[in-house]
A protein has these predicted regions:
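Soluble FAD-dependent oxygen oxidases
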Residues: 1-382
Length: 382
């Protein structure tokens, strides 16, 4: 349908994307035209929810949030009128739609995105013994803000599920540039971490194949990737604006050990997604996406496999997530609006921060009857 259509325009370096398109469809169609937009990893995620709430991805430090690449959008507002929102038409809706979250101001039917030429792509994976996890996390958080914007990385701490409380620590990422420059950018991390990785890979990859690797459907076609099924999981998130060290790092490592003892039969962990680069070059009030000073966004999650877990396990999982949120509390500066969290206290402030009053003002102007309403929609007054 036209709602899933992706139409690249190499002359204007733009792409018109229907609101129903999935990320893997966008990546596939644009790659065929040697173009990209920065967006998320999960192949079956819809472009609209992702873009309206920000959109972090593996090329975000190089090209910005997905929302930063919206040149204009078409939206049906609560009065039933289809409107074009851009820097010079309905500028308030355009501002609110770049980070203000989905389902708040109207029904988006299409986006026009700014696109970028596909660069050389390199992938990297580094793994260390669990005993090095604290040193690796601390080194990673201090290293990342000083890396080139072409580099994106995450740091993953995963429970191995054993009552002994061990786990897996790895740093993975994508570099939009030559292999030699990627290796050079990684050198300070390897030096700072202090110990040699147990596994190390750095190498070039085709752009579209790299997107399938990051999306968990390596080497598959668009239609195959679009059929990927996901395990059931529950998660929370915290933005971190300053590198953790000492007690903060120890507390996070302890959280992984705690998961294995609290609910030993489930998988889970904490992943720190890197921010910075051009994401943080944008002022916090330039768009509705306020999180412009973060070193990383931490997502802590537990995977169930499929279906709902027994109550006994669910209780343990909830307890661990809440305990981990408490561990992050001294360092947290909000939560990611696209990782919507039904149990988050003060969610509106956590998602939107200092932009909340303006978002509420725009909500009152365009949807005074609160027609577009859900449990965590933008409130009419803030």
């Amino acid at each position: 349908s036209s709602l899933r259509q992706v139409s690249p325009n190499t002359t204007t370096a733009q792409a018109v994307v229907g609101a129903g398109a999935h990320l893997i469809e966008v990546y596939g169609q644009l790659a065929a035209a040697q173009m990209l937009i920065p967006a998320g990893s999960c192949p079956t995620v819809g472009i609209t929810g992702l873009a309206l709430g920000g959109g972090i991805g593996v090329l975000g430090r190089a090209y910005g949030m997905t929302s930063d690449n919206i040149d204009s959008l078409q939206m049906v507002t609560a009065d039933g009128v289809l409107r074009t929102c851009s820097p010079n038409q309905h500028e308030d809706l355009y501002w609110a739609s770049r980070g203000g979250g989905g389902g708040n101001f109207g029904i988006v039917t299409s986006f026009t995105f700014k696109t970028h030429p596909i660069p050389a792509i390199n992938l990297f994976t580094l793994e260390w013994a669990w005993g090095d996890a604290g040193a690796v996390l601390e080194s990673w958080m201090q290293w990342l803000p000083n890396t080139p914007k072409e580099l994106w990385s995450n740091c993953q701490l995963d429970s191995n599920g054993s009552a002994g409380g061990g786990g897996v620590v790895k740093v993975t990422g994508v570099f939009a540039g030559p292999t030699a420059a990627c290796s050079s950018a990684l050198a300070p991390l390897l030096s700072a971490a202090g110990s040699t990785p147990s596994y190390q890979f750095v190498g070039p990859e085709d752009y579209f194949r790299a997107m399938t690797i990051e999306g968990g459907c390596e080497g598959e076609s668009v239609s195959q990737c679009d059929a990927v099924t996901r395990s059931a999981f529950v998660a929370k998130s915290s933005y971190i604006n300053a590198a953790l060290s000492g007690a903060g790092v120890s507390s996070i490592i302890d959280a992984i050990s705690s998961l294995a003892t609290t609910v030993p039969s489930v998988g889970g962990g904490i992943v720190f997604d890197g921010y910075g680069g051009v994401i943080n070059d944008v002022a916090a009030d330039a768009t509705a996406f306020v999180h412009r000073a973060a070193v990383a966004c931490a997502q802590y999650s537990v995977t169930y496999g499929s279906g709902n877990p027994p109550d006994s396990i669910a209780a343990g999982v909830t307890a661990w997530l809440n305990e981990t949120q408490t561990r992050f509390a001294p360092y947290a500066t909000g939560s990611y609006q696209n990782y919507i969290d039904p149990t988050l206290p003060n969610w509106a402030e956590a998602y939107y921060g200092s932009n909340l009053p303006r978002l509420s003002q725009i909500k009152r102007k365009w949807d005074s009857d609160d027609y577009f309403h859900f449990a965590q929609s933008i409130p009419l007054s803030a």
